[in-house]
A protein has these predicted regions:
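A conserved ligand/cofactor-binding region detector
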Residues: 1-375
Length: 375
């Protein structure tokens, strides 16, 4: 990668050709932005790998921050400043006749949050990386996290902000880390090969949760953590028949369509619950699987992870990790509960009764029968 202005200019012009098949002078400004963004992302790749290796090799304890929103804003300038390459890029682009500020304006605000809850989560991730701690975020990869305000015929209207329309240069899709999340169906008990009574979910609607990883770059310290965004795709397991496949696809699309669906209808309220479970189930399954791969055991997971739940939205993480440990990994109730009570933490944002979430028993028992049993 580049370490000076001359190397930067050479790399920038080369990438214009390799990415778009044309000289830099023929690239559109959005293409120039994408070239710069991918250069910055690739610049931190070695530090990203080193940070992961350090955690794995030293068996470090990690924080995983679950939040329905992360108001991270635009990342281009922040990432270049944290990497210490902003001035090199600015001067190199200027020599090429490109104003870096024009490229900065091409970046969309990430549609992952819209308020103080999301800004707090983003600040935590930024601070954790800059302090050199291994701490990561988990969120949904919303298609439309924001609304844009426009004036049409003299009136203010809100329209969806299609922030992913021109791609997100910071994310890397990781299909090999996909997990299966199950909704509906029924919980049944059975006897395993050791004669123990276990539970499992059957006849469920299965969704494949696919992660997209975004680097969270610490300030000039070579530490790079991860914000993992989950997207819903059709599962290869238990696909519905052609007659109901369209409804299945619609259900998948709804999961990641937007932040905080309208809860004035029953459908909207159930969708919120589905989103919340989708996030925590995908994130926890991924963490448990990674821990087993690194450590070869699960009885010490509470010594290696702490899961921070940002407000009430990810609270289903508590019964879900119980389900994962008991149903999928053979833990008894007391063993699982010991792990859970030593690795779950919660941030409360209000004590107003009307702002605290409550779900009808029928919603949880129908949508998540096994989780309902555990609760």
């Amino acid at each position: 990668m580049f370490t000076n202005k001359a190397d930067f200019k050479k790399e920038f012009k080369k990438r214009c050709v390799t990415k778009y098949g044309v000289d830099m002078s023929r690239c559109h400004i959005t293409e120039l932005y994408e070239v710069l963004g991918t250069m910055v992302r690739d610049y931190c790749a070695e530090d990203w790998k080193t940070s992961k290796d350090f955690v794995a090799n030293n068996h470090e304890k990690q924080l995983v921050y679950f939040s329905m929103e992360f108001l991270i804003g635009r990342l281009l300038v922040n990432n270049m400043q944290n990497l210490g390459i902003y001035q090199i890029a600015k001067e190199g682009l200027n020599d090429l006749g490109i104003d870096i500020h024009e490229l900065e304006e091409q970046e969309s605000d990430a549609g992952l949050g819209n308020g103080g809850l999301g800004r707090l989560a983003a600040c935590f991730l930024d601070s954790i990386a800059s302090l050199g701690y291994p701490g990561h975020g988990n969120c949904i990869r919303y298609e439309y996290g924001f609304f844009k305000q426009k004036i049409i015929n003299g009136r203010q209207v809100e329209v969806p902000d299609q922030w992913l329309q021109n791609t997100n240069v910071w994310e890397i899709k990781k299909p090999k880390h996909a997990v299966e999340v199950k909704f509906y169906g029924r919980a049944e008990t059975y006897q395993d090969v050791d004669g123990c009574i276990r539970s499992r979910t059957v006849d469920a609607m299965t969704v494949k949760a696919v992660p997209y990883d975004v680097p969270v770059i610490g300030y000039k310290n070579k530490v790079v953590n991860t914000l993992r965004l989950w997207s819903a795709e059709p599962s290869a397991e238990n696909l519905p028949s052609n007659q109901s496949f369209e409804q299945y696809l619609q259900a998948l699309k709804e999961l990641c369509h937007g932040l905080y669906p309208d809860d004035s209808t029953e459908h909207g309220r159930i969708l919120r619950l589905r989103q919340q479970y989708f996030l925590v189930s995908a994130g926890l399954q991924s963490m448990v699987r990674g821990h087993k791969r690194r450590e070869g055991r699960l009885d010490n997971i509470c010594d290696k992870f702490v899961f921070q739940l940002n407000d009430t939205h990810p609270i289903l993480a508590i019964p879900e990790i119980m389900r994962i440990l008991m149903d999928e990994n053979g833990f008894g109730w007391d063993e699982a509960w010991h792990q859970v009570t030593h690795m779950m933490a919660y941030t409360n944002h209000t004590i107003m009764a009307e702002a605290l979430e409550k779900w009808p028993v029928s919603y949880v028992s129908n949508l998540l029968p096994r989780v309902y049993m555990i609760i």
